[in-house]
Regions:
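Asp-based, Mg2+/Mn2+-dependent phosphohydrolase catalytic module
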Residues: 139, 149-158, 162-189
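Conserved SAM-binding loop
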Residues: 27-28, 44, 67, 149, ...
């Protein structure tokens, strides 16, 4: 963000060549004019940035437009305005941005369940905490320091990619178990079961512990 406009554009064009070679979409953060100038695949907009409709008019119908959403209301509005995906967070405490408060995972899950478009978890996601996103129904994650703050960027990228795939697979398993078990558990105030679907316990106290201590 400290680069001059010309330097930023030159670097964006070089990155575009690289992402195009590997079939990876290039999404520019905030800057719609730059996204158009470098022929990026899309743009990500914050709550204080240009409206989705304006960005769409500039970039065209094929552009991928993402919007930051920190609660269900923002998520629903962005979806209504035509966003293609949401970036929600901060999922965890992050050092990349200052004065950012982590969302409860409950809120992240509520956002995912409220909209029909993909939701990407952003903020503080790392190799150490990514499995906490299992069951939140996120479609993916966005990271900075988890890769670029590491000594071996390529190694960190490969490791995190594998962990993301594993997290998404576990989420699919979690959702399948949920759909299977819920009809059997109607009327229960709280249940505890492991990831292979084995019911461990069913008592009202679990619901209290869930809300009061886990915050989910």
């Amino acid at each position: 963000k400290e680069l001059s406009e010309d330097a930023f554009l030159a670097e964006a064009k070089e990155i575009k060549k690289l992402t195009q070679r590997y079939g990876v979409p290039l999404i520019i953060n905030d800057n719609v004019a730059l996204a158009k100038a470098c022929q990026a695949d899309g743009v990500h907009l914050g709550q204080g940035d240009m409206q989705v409709e304006e960005a769409r008019a500039i970039l065209g119908d094929a552009a991928i437009i993402g919007v930051s959403a920190h609660n269900v209301e923002e998520a629903l509005l962005a979806e209504k305005q035509g966003a293609d995906y949401l970036g929600s967070g901060s999922a965890f405490v992050t050092t990349t941005k200052q004065d950012v408060t982590a969302l409860p995972l409950k809120t992240l899950r509520e956002i995912c369940h409220a909209v029909q478009i993909p939701v990407v978890a952003i903020g503080g996601v790392s190799a150490e905490n990514i499995n906490q996103l299992v069951g939140c129904d996120v479609a993916g994650v966005a990271v900075v320091s988890a890769i670029f703050a590491q000594d071996e960027i390529e190694t960190a990228t490969k490791k995190l990619t594998a962990q993301v795939k594993d997290m998404l697979a576990k989420t699919e398993t979690f959702d399948a178990l949920y759909q299977k078990l819920m009809p059997l558990l109607q009327g229960k105030k709280g249940v505890l079961f492991d990831m292979d679907g084995t019911l461990i316990d069913s008592m009202p106290m679990w619901r209290t512990l869930d809300v009061e201590y886990i915050g989910r």
